Amino acid sequence: MAAESGELIGACEFMKDRLYFATLRNRPKSTINIHYFSIDEELVYENFYADFGPLNLAMVYRYCCKLNKKLKSYSLSRKKIVHYTSFDQRKRANAAFLIGAYAVIYLKKTPEEAYRALLSGSNPPYLPFRDASFGNCTYNLTVLDCLQGIRKGLQHGFFDFETFDAEEYEHYERVENGDFNWIVPGKFLAFSGPHPKSKIENGYPLHAPEAYFPYFKKNNVTTIVRLNKKIYEAKRFTDAGFEHYDLFFIDGSTPSDNIVRRFLNICENTEGAIAVHCKAGLGRTGTLIACYVMKHYRFTHAEIIAWIRICRPGSIIGPQQHFLKEKQASLWVQGDIFRSKLKNRPSSEGSITKIISTLDDMSIGANLSKLQSTERIGENNFEDEDMEIKNNVTQGDKLRALKSQRHPRSSPSCAFRSDDMKGHQRAMAQTFRLSSSPQPTMSTMKTSKVCLSPSVTAKKISRGSLSSGANIRSFSINSRLASSLGNLNAGTEEPETKKTTSLTKAAFIASPFTSFLNGSTQTPGRNYPELNNNQYTRSSNSNSSSSSSGLGGNLNSSPVPQSAKPEEHTTILRPSFPGSLSSSSVRFLSRSIPSLQSEYVHY
């Protein structure tokens, strides 16, 4: 290989005489025997502060699609394929993570083998990733940690690229479309905190609780856990048939043992998925979800931090990283005890979700008693909530504002034909397509099943023009939010008894609120004093509870009815419209997921 190109001396070999990774100072030209490609300017991390990676799950998917296509291309079949990157330490770390993830997912390499290949030759070390806080980095997350997180997620079935929909992932992670991501399929969804009313505030789109109802019900979300101060009435969720819990602790801080214990108890006794939010849905939310995954799936602190950031970039911040490191041993012991007790129980007692914990301070009765119990014994005392209110702009506010300033992507690089989306099989965490039919009664918590498709092959990446529906994604943030505002009845699912095989666009009713969008909106100010989150020291927790916040006077105590009037300007999360490909589009990812996908680990 060195004889063919002196530049490839020291390149990392992943497939002998076939796939290589190299760090080069200059952009090389492909030759008759070598094909070069780079993704440094194509797959770019959207940072909050000094954070620069790892790249999210959709970008990992797109990279794997791209590389699989090259490896299966007839025109490149006799060439060595070289993924090259620059000496920019941040881009280089992300590029190494991508090809390492490919090696773990498709080449059946262990994380250690993939990382060893990355270190071979004359390659310098890789810059470790950091958190999204303002201030000095106090916790290093290495490329190896991220590969180990990918491996654990694959082992436990947390993702499956045969059924993954990158368009839906990228659609719903946008702040104007809900700002949420699945962390554990069918179990945990992390999202930004709802607001009393759907509106745009300082350029940031805010969504009322009712905007999430159709999606939550469709995806079997039965429980909401709020970790921030109360800015909406929990009654709006409970009246719609959801369970709702309040486990407040200060923005940017770490939870007390009591809060962790009660969060785990709630999750272990909940049937269905749990939607967890704080203010931005990043720090506090990621920390508690991480505790559950460490206990029940035996992730290390580094593995779960890596996995959650791959699913939802910016999660787990500052002292929360060190908190998880400190809690790892005790959570593993708790998990071992939990599984031991479960193993010794008679099989007739049911699954994990039906096991009743012995905590004396938890009520598992009706909705009202649950709310009263959690509030009575909660950590969310007046002093802590008042402190968060007095601080005015908190870490969560800043992170949400920064995320809202991101420009919408022009057109997704992986489009799907509408025919391919008919009855497309999805993993448990996959999202749904809305139809124009009204939804059944909002009180039922049963969800219709997703149709299965004989085709599980991935779709060809397309750089071409998309259909008019997909072109909606190229509009400005105001146009996108305007198109998603309308009557709550719009865009809900078909009744379970009516099965449809065609994809229909959701009908959105125009609202007078769109006239506001056409005017000038204030850009989020960035002249606020920065919070050095890494210098935060935990304060002692109080056992007193709080029943309201300083913003309570502005809350709507009654839920918005289904037949919402246009002037109420209620937001509903719209679907992402698939693009189109020609009928001759190539399917190139068949049989690409190795047998590792079925290797579930039982502890």
Swiss-Prot record:
Disulfide bonds listed in the record: none
Key word Hydrolase present: yes
Location (main, coarse): nucleus
Stored PROSITE patterns: TYR_PHOSPHATASE_1, TYR_PHOSPHATASE_2, TYR_PHOSPHATASE_DUAL
GO biological process: cell division; sensory perception of sound
Record field: compositional bias (Low complexity): 539-558, 573-583
Entry-linked InterPro entries: CDC14_C, DSPn, Prot-tyrosine_phosphatase-like, PTP, Tyr_Pase_AS, Tyr_Pase_cat, Tyr_Pase_dom, TYR_PHOSPHATASE_DUAL_dom
Chain residue ranges for the region called Disordered: 518-583
Residue positions where Phosphoserine is found in the record: S484, S592
This protein's record includes keyword Hydrolase: yes
Single GO cellular component term: centrosome
The reaction(s) this protein catalyses: O-phospho-L-tyrosyl-[protein] + H2O = L-tyrosyl-[protein] + phosphate; O-phospho-L-seryl-[protein] + H2O = L-seryl-[protein] + phosphate; O-phospho-L-threonyl-[protein] + H2O = L-threonyl-[protein] + phosphate
Enzyme class: hydrolase
Alphabetized UniProt keyword annotations: Cell cycle, Cell division, Cell projection, Cytoplasm, Cytoskeleton, Hearing, Hydrolase, Nucleus, Phosphoprotein, Protein phosphatase
Assembly mode: Interacts with KIF20A. Interaction is required to localize CDC14 to the midzone of the mitotic spindle.
PANTHER family attached to this UniProt entry: TYROSINE SPECIFIC PROTEIN PHOSPHATASE AND DUAL SPECIFICITY PROTEIN PHOSPHATASE
Protein name per the record: Dual specificity protein phosphatase CDC14A
Lineage: Eukaryota, Metazoa, Chordata, Craniata, Vertebrata
Gene: Cdc14a
